[in-house]
């Protein structure tokens, strides 16, 4: 989007605060339904970040796949859970929980200082390939692959990191 720098910065702060509040809601809210709705807020804010960085295809895929399908599936799964079983295993924090929270808080503070010291306006998030590709001989799926590996490389890698974190979290939850 071609926005002026103050509007761009305001939208970054607004969406960033939406991401932080939604992420805190996912982790801290005791009701799983509210946590699932907070996850929806996080996914929508992430999609709006992609729109802000001119990655419209990735934003549409984020909205359709994650918000439209995965988050709705999570909400339905949480609605069918028995709520009384969820609160049986409540225990106080252990030493490992405290160490983990301190590591997470220090990582969060270092990320916030790095993000606040960086000028995000005018950064080119996509790269263009120097090769000329004849559009007549390439199918739509090949064009999507070419765009994902050239034009939208950084957003594609960021989504893969998000998926890896979600997979590790799902394995950790399934083990319990």
UniProtKB/Swiss-Prot annotation:
It comes from the Eukaryota. It catalyses: a plastoquinone + NADH + (n+1) H(+)(in) = a plastoquinol + NAD(+) + n H(+)(out); a plastoquinone + NADPH + (n+1) H(+)(in) = a plastoquinol + NADP(+) + n H(+)(out). Keywords: Chloroplast, Membrane, NAD, NADP, Plastid, Plastoquinone, Quinone, Thylakoid, Translocase, Transmembrane, Transmembrane helix, Transport. It is an enzyme of class 7 (translocase). Its EC number is 7.1.1.-. NDH is composed of at least 16 different subunits, 5 of which are encoded in the nucleus. This is NAD(P)H-quinone oxidoreductase subunit 6, chloroplastic. It comes from Nicotiana tabacum.
